[in-house]
């Protein structure tokens, strides 16, 4: 949240009766009611009861379908906000951890339930791959083989994109160095393995696990700075 740091739901795993509440799985909203409660708690803490003249950024998996985006928009609209900005998690990660220079960029997001590789060209998604597996699926794996298994998933997706790339964008993005995000990028054995296999440097934010949310916040701050100043209201200020 601009000016207030990161604001997270303090009880994301607690339902109204003390049970587990996992409204989003594999990047999809599977329990809209629980998701609405979670968003409501965050909005209460961040915005208070009056959500007028407020802006929310919605970041979604890069290959999220129209049905998922529509469901998410509906939940956010129910909060009473004025405007919702929708962008992919890859664009958010690039905004925070990507280089300032233009050109093609690879974003590798290794999350708990999804692993994604995205090629951005001019800030727009040019190609993407998604594996419906993540860190949670590798629990219990031999630590010595963990980087190899996760790395193989990432490298297979990059190889697939390379084969379909007719303009050399993947090669240019690799020379620049991919942005690594998500919990998998917290592990130096994983990041070192990817750097060796790709033969290039990798780009990491201070806390890769929050790269996407920090990038979304950065974009939100930019939007708020450039939006028109509302006219002054008569009466007592609120």
PLM-predicted stretches and their roles:
Residues 1-107, 122-178, 184-238:
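Nucleotide/phosphate-binding catalytic cleft detector across ATP-hydrolyzing
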């Amino acid at each position: 949240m601009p000016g207030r740091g990161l604001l997270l739901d303090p009880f994301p795993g607690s339902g109204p009766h003390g049970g587990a509440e996992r409204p989003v799985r594999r990047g999809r909203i599977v329990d809209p009611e629980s998701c609405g409660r979670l968003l409501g708690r965050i909005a209460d803490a961040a915005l208070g009861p009056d959500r007028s003249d407020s802006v929310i950024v919605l970041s979604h998996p890069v290959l999220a379908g129209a049905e998922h985006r529509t469901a998410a928009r509906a939940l956010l609209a129910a909060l009473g906000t004025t405007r919702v900005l929708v962008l992919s998690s890859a664009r958010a990660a690039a905004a925070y951890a990507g280089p300032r220079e233009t050109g093609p960029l690879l974003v590798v997001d290794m999350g708990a339930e999804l692993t994604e590789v995205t090629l951005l060209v001019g800030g727009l998604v040019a190609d993407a791959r998604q594996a419906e597996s993540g860190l949670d699926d590798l629990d219990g794996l031999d630590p010595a083989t963990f980087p190899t298994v996760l790395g193989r998933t990432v490298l297979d997706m990059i190889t697939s994109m390379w084969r379909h790339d007719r303009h050399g964008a993947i090669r240019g993005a690799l020379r620049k160095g991919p942005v690594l995000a998500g919990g998998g990028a917290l592990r130096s054995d994983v990041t070192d393995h990817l750097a060796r296999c790709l033969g290039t440097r990798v780009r990491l934010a201070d806390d890769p696990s929050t790269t996407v949310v920090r990038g979304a916040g950065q974009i939100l701050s930019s939007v708020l700075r450039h939006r028109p100043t509302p006219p002054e209201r008569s009466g007592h200020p609120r």
